[in-house]
Amino acid sequence: MNKLETMDYININKNSWNAKVDYHLKSDFYFVDEFIAGRTSLNEPELELLGDIQGKKILHLQCHFGQDSISLARMGAEVTAVDLSDKAIVEARILAEKCGVDVNFIESNVYDLANVLEEKFDIIFTSYGVIGWLPDLDKWAKVIQHFLKPNGEFIMIEFHPVIWMFDDDFTKIAYDYQSTEPIVETYEGTYADREAN
């Protein structure tokens, strides 16, 4: 993918995520009311990987509207979280305020993060459904390396890539497992609300 194609892809991706935010906030998938009341968004596998994070500096990449970021802060971490979607970051800040939690939310293309952030982190965290949207995993890995303290940890919890072989209805294999192209999805609604327009 050339630079122009990459920027086009990133802008399309940003617009897509901006369009999903309101639907996701209202969906049962994200259980926002329960979350504000104290329910964590983190599942057992990532909680086990994270362990005791009290006082640790964590960078959360591709945070959407911040549920996992806020959950990490509730566990005592000092959290900085980044997302491409400006709308998601606005809503993340509102959600953090409703939860009474302090998180530094940054709106940025993850590849350009070094232009707006200078810190180093004990842990870099990312979760579920993030790598399929990235047009350049090598460049993403360099971002992680740049922000990680010596002896720091990168913790990623992600779906197995075999999931990306299936069609949008998950009924048949439609894509090559070894594909190096970005994923392009065409469907009605969002993964959190299939009725969303």
Where is each model-derived feature located?
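A short His-aromatic
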Residues: 132-133
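Class I SAM-dependent methyltransferase SAM/SAH-binding core
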Residues: 57-113
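A conserved mid-domain beta-alpha-beta active-site/ligand-binding segment of alpha/beta enzyme cores
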Residues: 193-197
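Residues lining the SAM
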Residues: 126-128, 157
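Conserved class I S-adenosyl-L-methionine
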Residues: 1-54, 67, 153-189
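A short acidic, Gly/Pro-enriched loop at the edge of an enzyme's catalytic core
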Residues: 115-124
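A short glycine-rich, Lys/Arg-flanked "PGG" loop and its adjoining helix->strand segment in the class I
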Residues: 138-153
